[in-house]
Structure formats: C-alpha cells, structure tokens
C-alpha cells in the first residue's frame, strides 16, 4: 500500500527534467501532466500516462526503498521504467504498450549498449558530474529490458512475490542489487544472482550465431559491437534461450562461449528468442533465414518475431556482417505487413537509409524502397482514423504520411496544404493526431510567407503542446535562411530554456539543416550553454545532435572545440557521439562499395 496520506501532482512551467518523483509531491512539466481531450494527440495521452506511472512507481522504487549509492541507480530507474509499462498496460491493454516497449526501450538501449563507450547497468560513480551522465538509456531502458527478461525466466508470479519480499524487507531503508536478487531467488528457488551478474555488472550484450545441421544446432555468443575491436571477443553472458519449433517450445541456459543443442524435430523450422524476451540479438545461417523469410511472408510467425528477425538483420548490415542488398531483398517478405512495430521499425530503417545516402548517385534506388513501403502503410491506413481502429494506427499513420511527404509525394503534400488552409479557418477541423504531421509537411514545401504564418501561430498558441507543434514546423523548412531564423529565435525569450534542445535536434535531422548546423553551434555555443544553464542535462542532447551533422573526418575538429569549451557532465556523451559518427561513416562507405 502507498504509505503516505496524500500524493500531489504539480505542473511546473519551466522544468529541465521531465518530472521528479518527490515523495508525496511529484513535479512535472506542463506538457507531461496536462491533457486536453480536444487538443492533445494520442501520443501525448500515452506519454502522460507513462510518465505519471513512472513517477508513481518511484514512490516505492526509489522513495520507500532507496538505492545505497549511485552505482545502483538502476534499482530506481529500471524499475520505474518496467513498472510504468506494466501499469499502463494493465489499464489500457488495447495500447499494446509492451510491443511499443520493444520498439522504443529495447531498440534505444541496444543502440547505446552496442557502443564501446557504453557502461554497465551497475556503474561506478566517482564524481558528482558523472551522476548526470548515467541517467541514460542503460539505467532506464536496458535495466527495464533485463527485468522483463528475468520476469519471464522466473515466472511473473514468483517475480511479484520476490518484489513484495524485497520492498517489505528494505522499506524506509537502502538496498543494493544483490538484495533484490536474494529476494527473488529465494521465492523462485533459482540462483539468479549468478545469471543476473552477467547482465548487470558487464557492459554490452551478446549476439548469438546459430548454424543448423539436421536436428543439431551450434550456437556461439559474442559481444555485439557497432565498432568491433578485440574486446568484442570478451564477455560471456548467461543467456535464457527460448526455442520455438512451432508445435513445441523449449528453454535452455547458454552459459558458455559455444554450445550445441538438439531440436525436437529436424524437419521443422525454429526461432530462438521467440517473443524477444531476451536482451540479445540473433544471427541465423542463410538457409534458416531463407526458411524464416517464407514464414514471415505468410505471417506464420507472430508479429514480435517478424519484428525481431528484421531488426537483427538490419543491425548486422550496420556492422558490415551482412550485405545491404540482401537485407533489402529480405524485406520483400514484409510488404503485406500489418502490425505496428514490425511496420514502423522497417519503415524507419528504410527512411534512415535514404537519409544516410541521399547525396549518393544510387540514392534513388534506396529512396524507392522507402517510398514503396511507406506507401503500402498509407494505402492501408489513409489520412483519417477509422472507427474502433487500433490505438497504434494513429502513431503509424503520422510517420508514414510525414515520410512520404519528405520523399516528395505530391499527393500527400497537396493534401497537407489543403488541410492546413482549413485549419487556419477552423482549428478544430484538423485532428490532433495529424496536426504536427501536416504542419511539418506544409513547412517542408513552404516559403517565407509560410514561415511567418507558423511564427504567428506559435506566438498566439495558448498550450505548450500546441506551441511545440508549431516550433516543429519552424524547424522543417528547406531554406537555410529560415532555419537559421528558427535557431536564433530559440536563443531568445519566446522559447523556454527547457525546450532549447528541441529545435537543434530537429534541424540536425533535417536534410537541409545538416549542412550548416555544426558551424552555427560553434558560433553560438556560449549562448546555448548560458540559456540552458551549466549542469542542465539537456545539454547532453545538444552534444549528441552533433553526431547527425558531421562525419568522421571532422572528429579532430570537434574534439579540439570541446577541449577549448569543456562542459562537465557531457564527456561520456561526446565519446559516444564520436563513436556513432565513425560507425555511420563506415556504414556509408560500405554501402557505397556495394552499390557503386
């Protein structure tokens, strides 16, 4: 039971953190607490529910039981992330939040944990400035994924009883990671502390390679790294394997570098890590992958496994282990895909490939893949919501329409303009779920006159959610002079300091903003830091955005700049950003060799 007599929730106008779990008096940004059914989007409604649940979970995980030291930050944040998903899913099962958890939390965590510059979930902290840096996707998302994996391993009933034991024993006190493992292990009657040690105290995660010969499969685990070194050979995880052969499912623990297992049926297809409960990737031999492709095409495999196989395949293209053309051929099996996460993840990959290669001679070929797949989504969903459609359709629809517009679909751009003109006459005429998409596309094909309209709308907007939609539009023009105007506007009083990173991040991913943003950042760095305030965690996002606009040749220049302009608390982010730049440049070079 909640131990205090009251729990207040307070909206704060300018707040760098999204929310703060003060015991009995949780504080939030206005946009993360205040929901208006008439003007708020489906995404906003969902995000508010998740953040409120996250902060309420902290009343137990963080407040009732508090970590002993910062190395166990995950006991607070991983649990709040995990429990928030569980809570919202309980109230709104139709939102398919656990599916979205895979697409958002697991993808984000794996993206960071695949870097050499990542860190373990349980990480040493030696200086106060290092504390801010570990409030990242490892402490939140990877930890949440590992807890989900553990729950599946010990069963949800044992997991719940173990948590109750842990909270009761350590109430109004401090705890460490091993205290949690003792409580859950005692209930589950399994030595989970040894298994969890490899996931909590060891940086990174494994990729499991599998080769099949008849009913025999040979498995090998190595650390998955985007930038491979000798250290990739280090590390052994205790991996809970779930092998699905269609009519039979078996569970195993892989605790060696290499291991062999026997399938129940040498004639049947199989998939490992079914349901993607484990925090690891799979690399199948080519024959197994071909067989799985047929099962994907016919939708014999469930949608999570369809998502998982494509997601793992793409990740190996980025590292150079698989050829991109083979991956693109493989994606043909998904052109009748109708599930949210499976469709969205593939659409994002295809669009990001176009963004990466848009200056190359062969980019039209990749652009066509992205266009065709986005068009199949659009043809299925259309512009307007249908009665009783899935909650996630609104999220997927906006991505597909936005992507098509930016790829030059004239029909989409014309319809966006038509709906925007109606909106100017009657703001209730445009669905909240489509507003940002329409605004962004109108700006994308707009001019100075359009810019003035959005600036006026921004200044007149009453809600922060609406202001942020218009600000997104101001970041979406193609003209350099208009984007520079937006950046200068960001430094002024009309944009709250809590939002300073948003226009920079938006323009960093704008194909036309990439060309000049780094130069602008260098010139205005002191103004940015002054407005944000030294120590503001949002500055890490500004540093990370640099990775979108530079290439590996500029690494020395960037390091020289930050040596002259040091910013305590962003050192780890800078190293991770530089590594991502090297990985991206290497990936582009490998694509050039393959397609030239």
What are these regions (language model features)?
Residues 232-238:
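Short coil-to-beta strand junction motifs in C2/discoidin
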Residues 258-260:
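Surface-exposed ligand/attachment interfaces on beta-rich extracellular proteins
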Residues 107, 137, 218, 229-231, ...:
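Long, ordered, helix-rich scaffold segments
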Residues 252-256:
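Solvent-exposed serine/threonine-rich low-complexity stretches and specific carbohydrate-binding patches
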Residues 1-230, 348, 352-353, 359-372, ...:
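Hydrophobic alpha-helical and helix-loop surface patches within well-folded domains
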């Amino acid at each position: 039971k909640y131990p205090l007599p009251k729990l207040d929730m307070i909206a704060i106008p300018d707040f760098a953190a999204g929310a703060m779990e003060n015991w009995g008096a949780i504080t939030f940004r206005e946009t993360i607490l205040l929901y208006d059914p008439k003007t708020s989007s489906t995404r906003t409604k969902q995000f508010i529910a998740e953040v409120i649940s996250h902060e309420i979970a902290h009343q137990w995980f963080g407040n009732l039981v508090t970590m002993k030291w910062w190395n166990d930050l995950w006991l607070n944040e991983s649990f709040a992330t995990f429990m928030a998903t569980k809570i919202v899913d309980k109230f709104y099962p139709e939102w398919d939040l656990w599916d979205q958890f895979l697409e958002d939390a697991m993808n984000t965590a794996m993206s960071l944990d695949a870097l050499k510059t990542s860190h373990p979930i349980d990480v040493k902290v030696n200086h106060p400035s290092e504390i801010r840096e570990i409030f990242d996707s490892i402490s939140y998302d990877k930890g949440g994924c590992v807890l989900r994996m553990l729950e599946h391993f010990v069963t949800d009933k044992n997991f719940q009883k173990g948590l109750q034991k842990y909270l009761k024993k350590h109430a109004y006190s401090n705890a460490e990671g091993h205290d949690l493992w003792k409580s859950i292990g005692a209930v589950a009657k399994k030595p989970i502390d040894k298994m969890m040690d490899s996931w909590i105290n060891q940086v990174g995660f494994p990729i499991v390679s599998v080769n099949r010969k008849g009913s025999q499969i040979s498995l090998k685990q190595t650390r998955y790294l985007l930038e491979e070194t000798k250290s990739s050979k280090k590390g052994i995880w205790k991996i809970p394997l779930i092998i699905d052969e269609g009519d039979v499912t078996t569970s195993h623990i892989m605790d060696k570098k290499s291991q062999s297992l026997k399938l129940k049926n040498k004639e049947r297809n199989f998939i490992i890590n079914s349901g993607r409960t484990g925090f690891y990737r799979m690399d199948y031999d080519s024959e197994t992958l071909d067989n799985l492709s047929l099962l994907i095409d016919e939708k014999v495999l469930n949608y999570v496994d369809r998502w998982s196989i494509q997601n793992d395949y793409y990740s190996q293209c980025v590292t150079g282990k698989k050829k991109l053309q083979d991956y693109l051929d493989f994606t043909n099996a998904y052109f009748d895909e109708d599930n949210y996460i499976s469709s969205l993840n593939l659409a994002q990959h295809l669009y990001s490939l176009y963004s990466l290669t848009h200056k190359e001679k062969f980019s039209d070929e990749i652009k066509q893949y992205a266009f065709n797949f986005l068009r199949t989504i659009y043809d299925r969903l259309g512009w307007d919501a249908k009665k009783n459609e899935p909650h996630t359709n609104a999220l997927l629809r906006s991505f597909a329409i936005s992507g098509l517009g930016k790829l030059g679909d004239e029909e989409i751009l014309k319809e966006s303009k038509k709906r925007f003109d109606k909106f100017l006459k009657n703001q209730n005429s445009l669905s909240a779920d489509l507003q940002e998409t329409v605004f962004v596309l109108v700006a994308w094909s707009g001019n100075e006159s359009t810019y003035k309209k959005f600036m006026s709308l921004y200044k007149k907007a009453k809600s922060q959610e609406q202001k942020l939609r218009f600000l997104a539009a101001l970041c979406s023009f193609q003209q350099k002079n208009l984007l520079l105007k937006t950046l200068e506007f960001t430094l002024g009083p009309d944009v709250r300091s809590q939002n300073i990173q948003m226009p920079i991040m938006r323009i960093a991913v704008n194909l036309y903003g990439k060309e000049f943003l780094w130069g602008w950042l260098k010139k205005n760095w002191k103004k940015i830091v002054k407005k944000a305030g030294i120590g503001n965690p949002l500055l890490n996002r500004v540093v990370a955005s640099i990775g979108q606009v530079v290439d590996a040749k500029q690494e020395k220049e960037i390091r020289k700049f930050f040596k002259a302009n040091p910013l305590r608390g962003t050192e780890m982010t800078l190293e991770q950003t530089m590594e991502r730049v090297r990985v991206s440049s290497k990936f582009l070079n490998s694509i050039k060799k393959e397609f030239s």
